[in-house]
Amino acid sequence: MAACRALKAVLVDLSGTLHIEDAAVPGAQEALKRLRGASVIIRFVTNTTKESKQDLLERLRKLEFDISEDEIFTSLTAARSLLERKQVRPMLLVDDRALPDFKGIQTSDPNAVVMGLAPEHFHYQILNQAFRLLLDGAPLIAIHKARYYKRKDGLALGPGPFVTALEYATDTKATVVGKPEKTFFLEALRGTGCEPEEAVMIGDDCRDDVGGAQDVGMLGILVKTGKYRASDEEKINPPPYLTCESFPHAVDHILQHLL
């Protein structure tokens, strides 16, 4: 376990760490209140593409989480920023509930493909349209490439397998904007005044949450909720700084050993 260092910021994953769909992880609300009592900056970072930031915030508040909109950094935010920098017109393969986060982005006559988690759109006709755009030279932008995520009824395919299918079919490589990309974590820390070495990431995905954070110099805490499966902590090198049962246990460790 790494030595204690000056901790200034805590990054927290949402789905699978604080909640699973419309159910909170037991004890998570109270644990967040305890963490807020410490002298640390908190940011909530998520790869979710199933809903807009506003809808996500409403879901969290209904679960009685004390969270403000400016504390949330999403992969949809990162994707929009990239689209604006590149000045492209995307074919948006995202859930309809996520479309408000792309308001004002021109989508007619698309010359780029943006792919998130959009089960209703992942059928042959739509994917073939994306395939043809890519063959014509359009860039492929993946909001993230998670292999799977946790639902109430079990694990479910994430966008990663569908992004990889288009990469394979077109012999191209997607630009990924969400976790575990280094730029995602650095952007999430922007404005906090904190360096990666002064931050810790808590999440249920060993690769995207913990591995990605540790690659930029943060500590990574893996929780055994959400998509976690036995021995996940052995799948990355270096291994997680800490593996624990749930978010409340992670908060206990931070308060007792990192502050």
Swiss-Prot record:
Residues with the modification N6-succinyllysine, per the entry, are K50
Q: Which family is it part of?
A: Belongs to the HAD-like hydrolase superfamily.
Query: Which key words are in the record?
Result: Coiled coil, Magnesium, Metal-binding
Q: How is the cofactor bound?
A: Binds 1 Mg(2+) ion per subunit.
In terms of SUPFAM superfamilies, this protein maps to:
HAD-like
Q: Which Pfam families match?
A: Hydrolase_6, Hydrolase_like
Q: Which residues bind Mg(2+)?
A: D13, S15, D204
Q: Which residues bind substrate?
A: D13, L14, S15, T46, N47, K179
| Residues in coiled coil | 47-71
The name under which this protein is listed is Haloacid dehalogenase-like hydrolase domain-containing protein 2
Q: Record's Gene3D superfamilies?
A: HAD superfamily/HAD-like
Q: Whose protein is this, by species? A: Homo sapiens (Human)
Cofactors, names only: Mg(2+)
Gene Ontology cellular component terms for the protein in this record? cytoplasm; extracellular exosome
Alphabetically, the GO molecular function entries are: enzyme binding; metal ion binding; phosphatase activity
